[in-house]
Amino acid sequence: MSDHASEITRGERFEFGANWRRFLDSLTPQRVAEAERSLCEMLGCDDLRGKRFLDVGSGSGLFSLAAYRLGARVRSFDFDPESIACTAALREKFSADDDRWQIETGSALDANFLARLGSIDVVYA
């Protein structure tokens, strides 16, 4: 049993992925546009071209998608396998084989994993 599955079984973690899957079923272009607008507002910018964007605990992948559409190189990670699947499904739907968006399994509590991420311009969590 994986660490994630063991922690779910012991009641130490909540499975967010199923909720994100339902959210993606109702995702509209308006919600994607709102995510883009909110990122620009929060960061005080018009776009993210040339920026490296890290989505910590990517969940549905909505803000990874928003950053990608704003021109960033995106790196998304989550500990929950179902959340990773949701983020990957969103990437597949909107960007297919574009290497500007990487998705991986990882934990914000794993110092070794974090050390391998390299230089980042924007961290979103």
PLM regions with names:
Residues 1-54, 60-118:
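Conserved N-terminal segment of class I S-adenosyl-L-methionine
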Residues 124:
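A conserved beta-strand element that flanks and buttresses the S-adenosyl-L-methionine
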